[in-house]
UniProtKB/Swiss-Prot annotation:
Keyword Ligase: yes
Cellular component, GO, one term: cytosol
Organism: Colwellia psychrerythraea (strain 34H / ATCC BAA-681) (Vibrio psychroerythus)
EC numbers: 6.3.2.4
Enzyme category, top tier: ligase
Name of the molecule in the record: D-alanine--D-alanine ligase
Main subcellular localisation: cytoplasm
Swiss-Prot/TrEMBL catalytic activity: 2 D-alanine + ATP = D-alanyl-D-alanine + ADP + phosphate + H(+)
InterPro entries according to UniProt: ATP-grasp (IPR011761), ATP_grasp_subdomain_1 (IPR013815), D-Ala_lig_Van_CS (IPR000291), D_ala_D_ala (IPR005905), Dala_Dala_lig_C (IPR011095), Dala_Dala_lig_N (IPR011127), PreATP-grasp_dom_sf (IPR016185)
Residues the record lists as binding Mg(2+) 2: 279, 281
Amino acid sequence: MVKALDRSLALLKQEKIAVLYGGNSAEREVSLNSGQAIAKGLEDAGFNVVLIDTKVVPLTDLVSNKIDRVFIALHGRGGEDGCLQGALEYLDIPYTGSNVLGSSLSMDKVRSKQIFKACGIPTAPFTVVNKAEFSTLSLENILADLGGRVMVKPANEGSSIGMAQAKTIAQLRNALIEAFGFDTQVLLEAWIDGPEYTVTILGDKALPAIHMETPREFYDYEAKYQSTSTQYHCPCGLNERDENEIKSLSMKAFNATGAQGWGRVDIMRNKTGEWQILEVNTVPGMTETSLVPKAAKVFGLNFSELVTQILQLSVKE
């Protein structure tokens, strides 16, 4: 096995690797930072790397530039939802991470929640609101059915973009209007009052869990990327049994949506001690200070070793 891995690594270092980053999604700025960090990590490991901003360079140029393999660093729409993966399949260029189906199902918060529920994976109660029916709905009944406080989430956005919490009819109406600016379908999820964790998946391994703490109402875009008061704990402070349990649940959720290679699963614990899976991220943030590199470091991998392993996982046997 070791010899096979060494051989695949040697072959990868003969390839021309494109790190695709930037793009047109609402997560463009995060993607630019991820792509630059990944490219540097791969270069430090001895790979032949070229950075390509898909907002500027058309994908068809990958063929003319003789790209052998792609490391996907595009977050959100167009990069994480199966569209890019389908284009790369058509161009016959191998790539990191999940395939078309796994990417699209994981990105879609509504479909992934439906899958979790069908598979018996614990997740908070929810309902779905479509833009076309918004004006005819009883927001009062929806709020009551979900316990009086909800998280409002556009179905296909990441980095907490377009998300808000609501506990009054007016707040819910305003949050839905805001969310419909990003998507025609919105997930309403019962509010979970408890700590949030995240588990990185790398191949068949679940890395050490991270506990995120923020003084804000929830772990929103500002808490993730702008706040200096957000705290990250890894080791996460759970006992061995509880950590093993969230690792197992995270792996089940990852496999349930058809995700592959690597990713990150977000999970919360409610007041009664029950775990609630939030979502699967198939292209999580990858700056030097992002969550996945933090977990990898505790696991014993530096950043270059981490991106090398992700690239190796793209080699199909």
